[in-house]
């Protein structure tokens, strides 16, 4: 067996749309201290497992029912397709494994297989273009913790957030360009939200985020861990590549929880505002998601469209994520080849 391999890690999905399966998934997901990080224990566990998850599970199960396919979860299906296509592109000398941060296949079980297969060098590619403690960071921490437990000798290299990588932007443009070419009035870039507090928590200097005027547009080393600055950078790069007019596109944030301020403006509010302002034809793009999932297929394509149309909009199009399209497979393959070449030196 080859001694070098690739590990793709995505978010995950419930095993089914049943309330017990969804509850089990949410218990693991929302129980992650990097997703919901307060209050202090034991109160956080009580809040998550006795209040939030029981209340959310039935509604979340219904939402999953709206997007579930005969083959199961769209995110899992697409992630497997990415794994298979990347493996076919790289060839048998570089196996590609797939794990989910929450649910199955778990990071622990997949790393067990990697160790059993005799892999000594591993390239970890979190399926997140941007840094956030609740997405990219939790994947990396979990993989390194599990690797240290199962295989201390395993050498793990991690692909850093690629939010402004020219090849990533080109892949986004290749998939989005046919939609940009269609008649439309406005493009809304909708990114997954995070608590504002998480931005400040990620600022190791404690002197920039929410302190410096226009902090996300003021160059700083702390942008290496600033989710908001990174999504702005993605938006600027893709808008420039596509030639989008500055007054015909903007950024919003979706998927917020209640209880504290999250990044704004909120996507549902923006869809309503834009429709009431006379925007009739809107394109919605979700670059933080590499694979279409609950947040794009239900929250945007179903609920978002309903919000926009009810407020007076007429044409609503959610531009698909990169999914398993050739430009994204090529992007991943190039990242792997760069690593393979570097590890030969």
Swiss-Prot record:
Pathway assigned in UniProt: Porphyrin-containing compound metabolism; protoheme biosynthesis; protoheme from protoporphyrin-IX: step 1/1
EC number assigned by the record: 4.98.1.1
Keyword line: Cytoplasm, Heme biosynthesis, Iron, Lyase, Metal-binding, Porphyrin biosynthesis
Function: Catalyzes the ferrous insertion into protoporphyrin IX.
Pfam families, sorted: Ferrochelatase (PF00762)
Listed GO CC annotations: cytoplasm
Protein name (database record): Ferrochelatase
Superkingdom of the organism of origin: Bacteria
GO biological process: heme biosynthetic process
Gene designation: hemH
Localisation: Cytoplasm
Gene Ontology molecular function: ferrochelatase activity; metal ion binding
Residue sites binding Fe cation per the record: 192, 295
Keyword Cytoplasm appears in the UniProt entry: yes
Protein source organism: Opitutus terrae (strain DSM 11246 / JCM 15787 / PB90-1)
Reaction catalysed by this enzyme: heme b + 2 H(+) = protoporphyrin IX + Fe(2+)
Keyword field contains Metal-binding: yes
Family according to the record: Belongs to the ferrochelatase family.
CDD domains named among the record's database cross-references: Ferrochelatase_C (cd00419), Ferrochelatase_N (cd03411)
């Amino acid at each position: 067996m080859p001694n070098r391999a690739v590990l793709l890690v995505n978010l995950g999905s419930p095993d089914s749309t049943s309330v017990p399966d969804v509850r089990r998934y949410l218990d693991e997901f929302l129980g992650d201290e990097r997703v919901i990080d307060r209050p202090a224990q034991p109160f956080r566990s009580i809040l998550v497992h006795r209040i939030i998850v029981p209340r959310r599970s039935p509604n979340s199960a219904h939402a999953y029912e709206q997007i579930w396919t005969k083959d199961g979860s769209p995110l899992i299906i697409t992630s497997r397709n990415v794994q298979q296509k990347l493996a076919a592109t790289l060839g048998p000398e570089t196996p590609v494994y797939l794990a989910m941060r929450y649910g199955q296949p778990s990071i622990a079980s997949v790393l067990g297989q990697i160790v059993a297969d005799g892999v000594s060098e591993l390239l970890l590619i979190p399926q997140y273009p941007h840094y956030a403690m609740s997405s990219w960071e939790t994947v990396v921490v979990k993989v390194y913790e599990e690797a240290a437990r199962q295989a201390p000798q395993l050498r793990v290299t991690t692909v850093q957030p690629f939010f402004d990588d020219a090849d990533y932007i080109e892949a986004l443009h290749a998939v989005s360009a046919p939609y940009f070419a269609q008649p439309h009035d406005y493009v809304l870039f909708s990114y997954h939200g995070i608590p504002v507090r998480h931005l400040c928590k990620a600022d190791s200097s404690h002197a920039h985020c929410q302190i410096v005027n226009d902090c996300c547009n003021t160059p700083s080393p702390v942008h290496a861990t600033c989710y908001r600055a990174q999504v702005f950078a993605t938006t600027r790069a893709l808008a420039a590549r596509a030639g989008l007019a500055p007054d015909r596109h903007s950024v919003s944030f979706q998927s917020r929880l209640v209880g504290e301020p999250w990044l704004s403006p909120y996507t549902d509010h923006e869809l309503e505002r834009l429709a009431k302002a006379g925007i009739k034809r809107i394109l919605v793009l979700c670059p933080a998601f590499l694979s279409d999932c609950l947040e794009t297929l239900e929250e945007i394509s179903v609920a978002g469209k309903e919000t926009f149309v009810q407020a007076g909009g007429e044409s609503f199009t959610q531009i698909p994520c990169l999914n398993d399209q050739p430009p994204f497979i090529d992007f991943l393959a190039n990242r792997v080849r760069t690593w393979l070449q570097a590890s030969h030196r």
